[in-house]
Amino acid sequence: MLRAIACESQGARHGLIDDEVTLDFDNRHRRRLAMRGKDGLEFLLDLPRAHRLRQGDTLLLEDGRRVRVMAAKEELAEITTTSAVDLVRVAWHLGNRHLPVMLLPDRILIRRDHVIEDMVRLLGASVAMVEAAFDPEDGAYAGGGHHHHHHGDDHDHG
């Protein structure tokens, strides 16, 4: 089976796109996964390690073709508050629980979770159900984006 062996970040625009895959959040963080593009191109995602694919990234196939990654619409909870301070407070509580969040200028999007939705309501926030692409923050320890360089582990722990 044809393999996707590398990924270019959304900012890198090199060459034409041959097909497109639309994936939900869970399926955009994989190492190996059989895929089928919207135009029928079948291939195996076969990366050296699990990698978080972002909206607009491009998968590079071993035969030189390129497949654009799109984020699928998902059921999300949209959190809003009446002030920026309250929104920051809610963001702090969500971060304290290590939840994936999508930060926008005036709202926060999270995956549906009735327990968390109740918690943010108790903090004074409003919660609405929306359907949107979910592309959350990487987090402080996620590393430098799409840098695929490995230094090895050849030092002595002795």
Describe the predicted segments one by one.
Residues 1-50:
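Intrinsically disordered, low-complexity, positively charged segments
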Residues 85, 127-137:
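Flexible glycine-rich active-site/ligand-binding loops centered on an Asp-His dyad
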Residues 138-158:
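Histidine-centered metal-binding segments
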Residues 53, 59-61:
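Short, well-ordered loop/turn sites that connect or cap secondary structure elements
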Residues 75, 107-114, 133-145:
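Short proline/glycine- and acidic-rich turn/helix-capping motifs at secondary-structure junctions
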